[in-house]
């Protein structure tokens, strides 16, 4: 991976605390993506309350995840953890019959040093169901890194690209008890090495990105994760991999070091500009010249004209929450917005090198100043800077949204960008809808004169409701 960072982009680091969801929230979208999986979160009542409230799914709906609640006997080592987990997994196999069970470790399992990795192989052999262990706990920087941890663990179970002659396939059969689906070649593809895309996206977005690459005669050999555990892609020497999300640096490192794959360092397909750059970075690797991307991007920008007129000249401040701030900021700058600061809990500068380069090029193209990038920002310092800058919009975690709104700054929850469909050419309108909603609300309240806190000319004033 390239380690060169553009010199004109300055990266600062403060000593702030992490203000983010717990990474076990990754269960909320991964259990829907991997359709034959079952997630077992090993934690305390607090973890259960969080999942119950964050996911909004009642237990009566029988979702494909559950809590293995630790009791006082587990903490004091009076109970046999192996037997307790075995009982739960046998019940899960009987009731839900999953192809894979994924144990999610929490802060408590880290503190009491529960040997989940040691118990999983033995229990896997006993019950005949693959068991993966992912420690997606609150020690991470951001909640999106829960997915990164799960995918990194899952990459170890992907079959090898080529099995040596005469080697037994017993291991592969054990890990993948279901036959792999045969692919149908409906399009004549270019002759190129295998390409695997990693990152969890809804099925419709997977189809969209597959279609975009198919138009360039590039065949996607598989996705990590796949919809079914048995359909995990083959990995190994000579396989090229490319990510779709900025928070998957741990997975990228695993694919490079452990599976010997070649990483394509590309910007991320968020927004029309990012999607075009993502495809343009993949094509030359396989000796293919990208076609018709510029015209495609221009058509998308033309269709967004009504939104662009609304956001052009507006300012935005990223407090930092989910590790996709760089990509969203780059897209908003391309839309004509002014980005004062990009706060981000953590950034792998090698994995996001191409995204940083695209950010700089976008600022130059739009004649915008390069925003300040602050890693691990201190919220107190950020609030002081916001008081001076008075941005039109702050993209922040939920904890700071209401206090900032009371001070006349429009806010948008950063978590909404995580769960919204923001990838590909076709979903740029959804991103702008999220951004413009608080801007339109503030303008409407201003026109109605029915709010007690409205900002005009960067000053707060109190208005009396119309009787």
From Swiss-Prot:
EC class name: oxidoreductase
Database matches in SUPFAM superfamilies: Helical backbone' metal receptor
Keyword Protease: no
Example GO BP: photosynthesis, dark reaction
Keyword field: 4Fe-4S, ATP-binding, Chlorophyll biosynthesis, Chloroplast, Iron, Iron-sulfur, Metal-binding, Nucleotide-binding, Oxidoreductase, Photosynthesis, Plastid
Family annotation (Gene3D superfamilies): Nitrogenase molybdenum iron protein domain
Recorded family membership: Belongs to the BchN/ChlN family.
GO MF term set: 4 iron, 4 sulfur cluster binding; ATP binding; metal ion binding; oxidoreductase activity, acting on iron-sulfur proteins as donors; oxidoreductase activity, acting on the CH-CH group of donors, iron-sulfur protein as acceptor
Species of provenance: Pinus thunbergii (Japanese black pine)
UniProt remark on cofactor binding: Binds 1 [4Fe-4S] cluster per heterodimer. The cluster is bound at the heterodimer interface by residues from both subunits.
Binding site for [4Fe-4S] cluster: 22, 47, 107
Keyword Chloroplast assigned: yes
InterPro entries, alphabetized: LIPOR_BchN/ChlN, Nase/OxRdtase_comp1, Protochl_reductN
The protein's role, per its UniProt record: Component of the dark-operative protochlorophyllide reductase (DPOR) that uses Mg-ATP and reduced ferredoxin to reduce ring D of protochlorophyllide (Pchlide) to form chlorophyllide a (Chlide). This reaction is light-independent. The NB-protein (ChlN-ChlB) is the catalytic component of the complex.
Domain of life: Eukaryota
Intracellular or extracellular location(s): Plastid, Chloroplast
Pathway listed: Porphyrin-containing compound metabolism; chlorophyll biosynthesis (light-independent)
GO annotations of cellular component type: chloroplast
Gene: chlN
Pfam families in the cross-refs: Oxidored_nitro
Cofactor(s) annotated in UniProt: [4Fe-4S] cluster
Protein name listed in UniProt: Light-independent protochlorophyllide reductase subunit N
Catalyzed reaction equations: chlorophyllide a + oxidized 2[4Fe-4S]-[ferredoxin] + 2 ADP + 2 phosphate = protochlorophyllide a + reduced 2[4Fe-4S]-[ferredoxin] + 2 ATP + 2 H2O
Main location: plastid
E.C. number: 1.3.7.7
Subunit structure: Protochlorophyllide reductase is composed of three subunits; ChlL, ChlN and ChlB. Forms a heterotetramer of two ChlB and two ChlN subunits.
């Amino acid at each position: 991976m390239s380690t060169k960072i553009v010199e004109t982009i300055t990266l600062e680091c403060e000593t702030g605390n992490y203000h983010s969801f717990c990474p076990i929230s990754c269960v909320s979208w991964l259990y829907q993506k991997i359709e034959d999986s079952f997630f077992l979160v090993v934690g305390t009542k607090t973890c259960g309350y969080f999942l119950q409230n964050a996911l909004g799914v009642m237990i009566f709906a029988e979702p494909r995840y559950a809590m293995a609640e630790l009791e006082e006997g587990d903490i004091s080592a009076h109970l046999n953890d192996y037997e307790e987990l075995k009982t739960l997994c046998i019940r899960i196999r009987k009731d839900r019959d999953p192809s894979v069970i994924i144990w999610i470790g929490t802060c408590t399992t880290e503190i009491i040093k529960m040997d989940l990795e040691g118990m999983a192989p033995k229990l896997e052999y006993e019950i005949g169901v693959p068991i993966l262990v992912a420690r997606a706990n609150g020690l991470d920087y951001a909640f999106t890194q829960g997915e990164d941890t799960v995918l990194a663990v899952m990459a170890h179970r992907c079959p090898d690209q080529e099995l040596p002659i005469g080697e037994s396939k017993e291991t592969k059969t054990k890990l993948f008890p279901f036959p792999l689906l045969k692919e149908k070649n409906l399009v004549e593809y270019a002759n190129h090495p295998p390409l695997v895309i990693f990152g969890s996206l809804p099925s419709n977005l997977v189809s969209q990105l597959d279609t975009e690459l198919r138009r360039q005669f590039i065949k996607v050999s598989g996705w990590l994760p796949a919809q079914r555990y048995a359909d995990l892609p083959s990995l190994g020497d000579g396989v090229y991999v490319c990510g779709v999300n900025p928070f998957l640096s741990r997975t990228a490192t695993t694919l490079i070091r452990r599976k010997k794959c070649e990483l394509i360092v590309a910007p991320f397909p968020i927004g029309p500009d990012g999607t075009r750059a993502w495809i343009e970075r993949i094509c030359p690797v396989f000796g293919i010249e990208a076609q018709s991307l510029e015209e495609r991007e221009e058509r998308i920008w033309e269709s967004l004209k009504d939104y662009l007129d609304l956001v052009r000249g507006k300012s935005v401040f990223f407090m930092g929450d989910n590790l996709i701030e760089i990509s969203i900021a780059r897209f908003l700058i391309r839309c004509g917005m002014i980005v004062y600061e990009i706060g981000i809990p953590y950034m792998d500068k090698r994995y996001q090198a191409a995204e940083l380069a695209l950010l700089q090029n976008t600022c130059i193209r739009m004649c915008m100043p390069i925003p300040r990038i602050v890693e691990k920002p201190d919220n107190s310092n950020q609030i002081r800077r916001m008081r001076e800058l008075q941005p039109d919009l702050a993209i922040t975690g939920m904890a700071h949204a209401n206090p900032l709104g009371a001070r006349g700054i429009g806010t948008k929850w950063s978590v909404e960008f995580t769960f919204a469909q923001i990838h590909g050419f076709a979903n740029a309108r959804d991103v702008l809808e999220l951004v413009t909603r608080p801007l339109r609300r503030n303008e409407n309240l201003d026109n109605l004169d029915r709010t007690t806190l409205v900002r005009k000319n960067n000053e707060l004033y109190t208005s009396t409701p119309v009787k």
